[in-house]
A protein has these predicted regions:
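Compact, glycine-rich, soluble single-domain proteins
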Residues: 10-93
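N-terminal export/targeting signal detector
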Residues: 1-10
Length: 93
């Protein structure tokens, strides 16, 4: 696990089965039930329910995206945890 530097927040994206990402990012954008939220270092603490869409984040100079359907978000001043219960495309017959 890389150390979080000033201007970064630690992002963890997890499912019940695995850790999809765990490391420092410059920012993250997460889909909630009522729209997108941007997460930056120093963000106010919150707990929210994910909506369908893409979790997007900037890590190491590259933007990464992950499609999600449902889950929860927990944010503190220096940490963001995205708990994904269903990834986009899962559950389709």
């Amino acid at each position: 696990m890389s150390a979080v530097q000033p201007g970064q927040v630690h992002l963890s994206i997890v499912t019940p089965e695995q850790v999809l990402f765990d490391g420092p990012v410059e920012w993250a954008r997460v889909p909630l039930e009522d729209g997108l939220i941007g997460i930056w270092p120093g963000h106010d603490s919150l707990i929210a329910t994910l909506g369908p869409g893409e979790v997007e984040y900037l890590a190491g100079g590259e933007v990464a995206r992950l499609g999600v359907e449902s889950g929860h978000l927990r944010v503190t001043e220096s940490r963001c945890v995205v708990m994904v219960s269903l990834l986009a495309g899962e559950g389709e017959a």
